[in-house]
Amino acid sequence: GRGGIGTVFRDKKIKAIVAKIDGVKGNLNNVVDLKPIMEKGKKFNAEMREFDDDQAEMRTKGTAHLTNVMNDYDLFPTNNFRFGSHPDAEKVHSEVYKKFFTQGIPDGCWIGCNMSCAKGVDNYLLRTGPYAGDRVIVDGPEYETAASLGSCAGIFNPDFTIEANFYCDTYGICTITWGTILGFVMECYEEGILNDERTGGLKLNFGNADTAMELLHMLAKGEGFGVTAGLGVRAMKLMFGEKGWGDPKFLFDIAMENKGLEYSQYVSKESLAQQGGYALTNK
């Protein structure tokens, strides 16, 4: 869903597309030789049941199990990719998210998968925005969202991440893109490229969860600095440079995007494959 399809939907006044068919089953794609696949599937499912609770814990934590793994290996994007780890990351440890996730129900993305790593937060009380006071179901957060709407903006608060996750889904905004945008504008603010006058009074320091949430709602309503942030990292770095709001080379260095698409949430220094994915993406 990344790359602008949400903008196309909005232009066409489409909220969502739902495809439904009768008779959903594991062999929906009509494979040529089903028997060996079923045998491998049984083996894979048995291994998940036996080992997952002691290894990745995907069945109870989903992809959010990666938060502490990435932090331990200095690969957890922090403060707009300045750092790969942070002492406060313990506040968003996978054990913390595990307590938020509803457990014990089949919540997978496909029939027959007994890992069911797609997690959700049920009965979550919203504190801000148009649905403040409502209790809702939040899909996720997945790892990418836990990092983008968290450490990338210097925010280590699961409640912020879960609520921002809900509103990004509701507003039709990519959580990865928005988190990387947040990291960029926060670094610009801390480096003096942006100031209170240019942000309309928003104090966009790393870690300022209240202002980050306010900016998300402004973006959705097309108000104030939310309009500027909504342009994306590439457009902002060019615009700020043209306005003389900072050294264009420095803006280029801190703009985590390629071909106009904001980076996903991995510090790529340890992975040539990840670097290639960022640099050679066809968007």
Predicted features and spans:
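Extended C-terminal regions of large enzymes
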Residues: 1-283
